[in-house]
């Protein structure tokens, strides 16, 4: 194996990977929806608080009108913080706009709508109670705001905003629900305080649900659609099972999810953004994936609560509604939550991606530009791999020098490839040429290349981040194809500096000639940040290789003169 062959293999692996990602796209414009599934609890599982066995479809609503509080039409409350604008009714967050993330870079662009009450593609977060022993519970419209007709806005001198709702039953049981928002945070604390002023025990359990109808844009894969490359679906985490996920298009494979988990969390992911329910630490919950009509549901159901007369209790959970910001996610101190930034389902590749992002973020804090941070990353990687690269370039320079002799050997032995190979290996041994010298530096770049691709696709910090001039968003393709064209030129020039092995198969030689064009076309569809990485990396490689060849040539001429003397 030689350097040229390794480069050919690397190129084909890259192209094959991208074609594989594109091959899996959904051909249909609509998602085939399975019927609602009824999921039961495995009987052998036991928890400190038993989780009831009920269906995983629509949220149960009590039918005993004598036990359910009156259900007047509840007004929708508007809440605005420095990062979120929401509509909520006490039972659900119906809509959520991310104020710091416009849909485009156009002036006056509207913010991203993560949760939405769009009737075609609704997406909401809901929490409520399910009765046991005929205890009264609030239904979809019985949480009333403590102050009606009021909109809430986080003032400039406030760091926290509390939005309270209340439900009261005829038998004296009441629940006060508060939504607590903090400045700069996307995690919302939702707390229920249950007080039993009646004469009979109150029994119920809490559920927390994410429900959405996926839009076709995230289901149909295409090389020109970065949203479709990013993982879209449900993910969950537990101490025992670790990080697990299920794509929307495979939502009910293997019978959905029906598992009791202590602690953990459950979330719905899309490109750059996610929602997640995070229960109290170590609280045992039943985790469910289900479908109800066209809706995909991710739900957790908490333990049953019994509140005796004259007693009170409290339960709370966090709801994340926002971007995949690594720094903010880390501050939540929730184990495994950083995996929502889904660099890869494979742990090793995910770790490489996390390491690359850590370097990029620190470079960005110094250079104040993500594009220059990518350039800086390339420089650091080239420095780190220079000892390996030096051996590669030295081997290439030697092979270039002895190329005429290899051609003579080829002409001498003609069609006898076995004798030619033996003579070639003897020459390599005599002149201390390592034909494998260029393999390892190229192979070691492969996981870095693919990990960086996912870093650029997944990192919301780079969304709409400019570099300079025509590159105004590093996560989208080069609009004028300048970087892909530069990549073609650099690869062509590198090929001219790299000696073609004398015994190389003619077909492989022709493939190597068109490889710059293939790579250039491929780079036209990848994020411009990745194309920038490849152009800078290739440019530095070309300069170093040119310098090493001339250095070796000067060294060889000097040794020849010394030998003559």
UniProtKB/Swiss-Prot annotation:
Membrane topology, record value: Multi-pass membrane protein
Regions crossing the membrane: 6-26, 348-368, 370-390, 437-457, 479-499, 516-536
Subcellular location per the Swiss-Prot or TrEMBL entry: Cell inner membrane
UniProt feature coiled coil, ranges: none
Entry keyword set: Cell inner membrane, Cell membrane, Chaperone, Membrane, Protein transport, Transmembrane, Transmembrane helix, Transport
A single GO BP: protein transport
One Pfam family linked to the record: YidC_periplas
Database matches in InterPro entries: Membr_insert_YidC, Membr_insert_YidC_N, YidC/ALB3/OXA1/COX18, YidC/Oxa/ALB_C, YidC_ALB_C, YidC_periplasmic_sf
Record-level Gene Ontology MF annotations: membrane insertase activity
GO CC terms of this entry: plasma membrane
Top-level taxonomic group: Bacteria
Family listed: Belongs to the OXA1/ALB3/YidC family. Type 1 subfamily.
Function: Required for the insertion and/or proper folding and/or complex formation of integral membrane proteins into the membrane. Involved in integration of membrane proteins that insert both dependently and independently of the Sec translocase complex, as well as at least some lipoproteins. Aids folding of multispanning membrane proteins.
Subunit structure: Interacts with the Sec translocase complex via SecD. Specifically interacts with transmembrane segments of nascent integral membrane proteins during membrane integration.
The protein's name: Membrane protein insertase YidC
Organism: Xylella fastidiosa (strain M12)
Gene encoding the protein: yidC
